[in-house]
Swiss-Prot record:
Belongs to the ATP22 family. It comes from Saccharomyces cerevisiae (strain AWRI1631) (Baker's yeast). This is Mitochondrial translation factor ATP22. The keyword Signal does not apply. GO terms for molecular function: translation regulator activity. It is found in: Mitochondrion inner membrane. Residues 1-56 form a transit peptide.
Length: 684
């Protein structure tokens, strides 16, 4: 019954029961406390609970709180404190029962607090925190076993009232108070905000901040299981895998498995739901095996999953659940691409182009992404553009390419913007090379454009003289900047991210060999009004590209970079901090280097970078407590450890090059391709 209360009832529970436990009387802290003799009578559906007195928890969440005040540290009005003290006196009685009425009372108190008119927002936040905190204290067993559900309007109020700088402490308060996460889109927004923030914020949102001490792992993972749904935990683990953050990945996969096993499947769709969840779990496992390079186990898991999907009858329920085939096939195509097996990739795509899966837009976008990314091996931007125009809306996409200056450099080898009639005439001569089933219809997306920029600049860096290539780079950059200012808002699905900017900076620094120009371009980009809306979507920060080994920059210019990062909310990354450590070591400024190393320690970054490890060892600095000491053995055994090259440390594996090339034999490829064919036959 408790699970139903916590996870199902989203409508005001006060309508379902008798009088609430507390009735608000109109001021910030005045409650009428109903007589104790009536409390048991009020509860229509009770759940007996046992109090576990003096339970010691291995973790003190207060250790992680920032200087920004939150919760009870801020204090509350004397009236509120007085009434809350009175509530504590009821703890012995109230802790024995918890049901619909108690939840309704809790909800009513929160909603009444939201509607107070004669107090400041800060006082209202304190009051909401106090209500949540004391609900947690009154029902410790409920908190320990199932957590607390908050009404959506409370999460909404928090989202719009709590400053971005206080998100860390707010989220920490929710965790301390055992508030169920992902029961509201607004709570999810807090999670996403933290994941896109600093390393500390990312570690809080993923609970990793508490896991560095092994004694905390059991307690924290129990909290993860309690506060997350299966789907939200899947999303969390996928995010860790995407970032190749494998420090605690086995613990999270075990938690996912527990979540999978503990769910109760009932009703006529129970078996189907159980099978669907198993496939979701398996897809996450496949993703991990792909990113970690475990090809042998990936192949086995992939084959077994497709066999299970067919044998379980899930293909009969593909509509609305197309992800069950989308993701495993996408992961397999990704493996073929990064293994440089283009021929096999094209063979699989030829099997797929007439399958029922092609009616799903997301699947077609997956397919085109892998197909176009695979063309990087050929250094042929015109080939990339042909497929782009054949798949996406050709007229809208051609207009975008023309405005960006790509069309001019690609087909005319110069900076030019065509008139509409000329562009239409040239577009008419471009033959469609894909079947209609593979057409997406919408304008080209930013990730595909990023691949086209990569291909064009890679080709131009070879075909053009250095001066011409520099002019090409700057012309494309200025037209891209103009497009973001004047045109991008016209396209509904346009997403301002750092992908294309990273491509420009990479080619300016490492191909054109213009490190100071890269610095000027970066500052120019972030001086534009649109820069505030640019999102970091990869693990690579553009500031890292500019700062790393850029010895042309003065101390004042590095300080300016930091100011621009702060102004635009760009978090410090491990790569940027490492770049600064190396900069100061080269300048023989031990104090400056240690200051930046302290930022790495404070941020909780994982250190596996051998050149940095060498610096730490040489300087006699302490290693972080979660440091893998086997890396020191590797350092001793390999006397040729050098500072990493430009293309290995400060380029993004997902954008510029992959870590190593997974290898698997032709027999494995044939088996996987054949099982895809058999699965598609069953789907037809």
């Amino acid at each position: 019954m408790l699970k139903c209360i916590c996870r199902v009832y989203s409508q005001p529970l006060a309508q379902m029961v008798t009088s609430p436990l507390f009735k608000h009387m109109g001021s910030a802290g005045t409650y009428t406390i109903l007589p104790i003799t009536n409390l048991r009578h009020l509860s229509t559906k009770n759940c007996p609970l046992k109090i576990k007195s003096n339970r010691s928890e291995p973790l003190q969440f207060g250790d992680f709180e920032r200087q920004v005040p939150c919760s009870r540290k801020s204090g509350s009005s004397k009236n509120v404190q007085k009434r809350l003290y009175e509530l504590r006196q009821l703890k012995t009685v109230l802790s024995e029962t918890f049901g619909v009425t108690e939840y309704a009372s809790f909800f009513e108190s929160l909603r009444n607090a939201l509607h107070i008119n004669n107090c400041s927002e800060n006082e209202k936040k304190k009051l909401l925190y106090d209500i949540i905190l004391h609900q947690h204290e009154l029902y410790p067993e409920v908190a320990r076993k199932i957590g607390f559900y908050l009404p959506g309007e409370v999460h909404r109020w928090f989202w719009y009232r709590i400053p971005k700088s206080e998100s860390f402490n707010h989220y920490l308060f929710l965790l301390k108070s055992d508030v169920l996460l992902f029961t509201s889109n607004y709570c999810t927004r807090f999670t996403n905000r933290l994941i896109k923030g600093t390393e500390m914020e990312r570690q809080l949102a993923t609970f990793q901040i508490f896991l560095h001490d092994e004694t905390n792992i059991k307690f924290i993972m129990e909290k993860v299981l309690k506060l997350h749904t299966f789907d939200s935990l899947i999303a969390l683990v996928n995010g860790l895998v995407k970032a190749k953050n494998f420090r605690f990945i086995k613990v999270f996969i075990q938690a996912l498995l527990q979540k999978l096993e503990q769910h109760c499947y009932s009703g006529k769709d129970g078996a189907k739901q159980k099978n669907l969840r198993y496939v979701k779990f398996n897809n996450t496992l496949l993703y991990y095996l792909l990113k970690s390079g475990n090809v042998e186990l990936f192949i086995k898991t992939f084959q077994e999953e497709l066999k299970f999907i067919v044998s379980s009858g899930l293909l009969n329920h593909i509509d609305g659940n197309e992800h069950i085939l989308n993701f495993p096939i996408h992961h397999y195509l990704n493996l073929l691409r990064i293994s440089n097996r283009q021929e096999e990739l094209f063979n699989v795509i030829s099997c797929l182009q007439s399958s029922p899966l092609m009616k799903y837009k997301l699947f077609k976008e997956f397919l085109m992404g892998e197909l176009i990314a695979s063309f990087q091996a050929f250094r042929d931007p015109k080939l990339v553009c042909k497929y782009l125009l054949s798949s996406y809306s050709s007229k809208a996409s051609a207009n975008i390419l023309n405005a960006l200056g790509i069309w001019g450099w690609l087909y005319h080898s110069k900076s030019t913007t065509l008139t509409a009639p000329t562009l239409a005439r040239e577009l008419k001569n471009k033959n469609n090379i894909l079947p209609n089933t593979m057409r997406i219809g919408s304008p080209v997306t930013v990730p595909i454009l990023t691949e086209l920029y990569r291909s064009l600049l890679s080709s131009s860096s070879v075909s053009l003289e250095s001066g011409q290539f520099k002019n090409c780079l700057l012309d494309l950059y200025y037209k891209y900047k103009s497009f973001l200012s004047e045109e991008a808002h016209k396209y509904r699905y346009w997403r301002n991210d750092t992908g294309i900017l990273n491509v420009f900076l990479n080619y300016i620094r490492f191909q054109a060999r213009e490190p100071r120009l890269a610095y000027n371009v970066l500052l120019d980009f972030y001086s534009q009004p649109f820069a505030k809306k640019v999102v970091l979507t990869t693990t690579l920060c553009p500031f890292s590209i500019v700062a790393y080994k850029n010895h042309t920059l003065t101390q004042a210019e590095l300080s300016e970079l930091l100011q621009v990062m702060h102004k635009n909310g760009v978090p410090l990354t491990f790569k940027f901090c490492s770049a600064m450590v190396m900069h100061y070591v080269k300048m023989r400024d031990e104090k400056g280097a240690r200051s930046w190393y302290n930022k790495i320690l404070f941020g909780g970054f994982e250190i596996r970078h051998m050149a940095l490890i060498q610096i730490i060892k040489d300087q006699g600095w302490p290693f972080p407590k979660n440091f893998d000491e086997t890396l020191l053995t590797e350092l001793v055994e390999n006397n040729n450890i050098k500072e990493p090259t430009d293309s290995t440390l400060f380029t993004d594996e997902d954008m510029f090059e992959e870590d190593g090339k997974p290898r698997f034999n032709d027999d494995d490829v044939n088996k996987c391709t054949n099982i895809i064919r058999e699965t598609l036959k069953s789907l037809n």
